[in-house]
Regions:
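Generic secondary-structure signature for well-ordered alpha-helical cores
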Residues: 34-37, 65-66, 105, 127-138
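Short glycine- and Lys/Arg-enriched binding-loop motifs that mark or flank ligand-binding interfaces
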Residues: 4, 8-10, 16, 49, ...
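Active-site metal-coordination/substrate-binding segment of hydrolases
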Residues: 1-43
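Histidine/acidic-residue-rich, glycine-tolerant segments that coordinate divalent metal ions
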Residues: 39-120
Length: 202
């Protein structure tokens, strides 16, 4: 639908996620050009399929490596620490996704008849997954942290200064306690440290 300005705010499909952010970036660069502040070339890659995995983007990037060469990447789709707190995200953790297939008997076995005699694939998978994160919240996969950057003293100070209410965070997601890697704050774990999460078993 057509964008409409109401009470000084832009209402439109995607205004919040993510066309609004992209529009802000475009306007910022427009101002920089008009004011003579831009000292480099800028390239825009805009696509609208992020919510379905951005089909075609990977192939496009591989086919146009020279065109897309750059020193810095600016991304629109990031979070804010609060509705009233403007936020600049200076880095993203990235994503690695795997599917693990565990095989067993040639059919679904009745646990009352076969239980205790045959390894249950789901039980075996749970054993594997249970060992991936230790009691301190650290991921045990070999070399997992080899290229993970250390949270700097400056970054920790900046995150520590962010107006953040952990109790409100817990209430919003309906939990009594938070967990994760020991030695880091919730914001540090959520923004600077890697995590291991199981997204489904079927």
């Amino acid at each position: 639908f057509e964008p409409v300005v109401k009470d000084g705010k832009l209402w439109a499909r995607g205004a919040d996620d993510d066309k609004g952010q992209g529009f802000i970036q475009l306007k910022a660069f427009e101002i920089a050009v008009k004011e003579g502040l831009l000292r480099c070339n800028v390239k825009f890659l805009i696509e609208g399929g992020e919510e379905i995995g951005s089909p075609g983007v990977e192939a496009f990037c591989k086919e146009h490596l020279d065109l897309l060469k750059c020193d810095v990447i600016l991304v629109s789709d990031t979070s804010m620490v609060g509705l009233d707190t403007p936020s600049i995200t200076t880095g993203l953790r990235g994503l690695a996704y795997w599917e693990i297939e565990v095989t067993g008997p040639n059919r679904d076995l009745h646990s009352g008849i076969f239980g205790g005699t045959v390894a249950n694939p789901i039980n075996e998978l749970c054993k594997m997954l249970a060992g991936v994160v230790d009691e301190n919240g650290r991921i045990t996969l070999p070399h997992f942290y080899d290229k993970v950057e250390t949270v700097s003293t400056q970054e920790r100070a900046m995150l520590g200064a962010v107006p953040y209410d952990e109790e409100k965070y817990k209430a919003a997601i309906g939990v009594k306690e938070l967990s994760g890697e020991k030695g880091y704050s919730t914001l540090e774990r959520n923004s600077c440290r890697p995590s291991f999460d199981v997204c489904g078993i079927w």
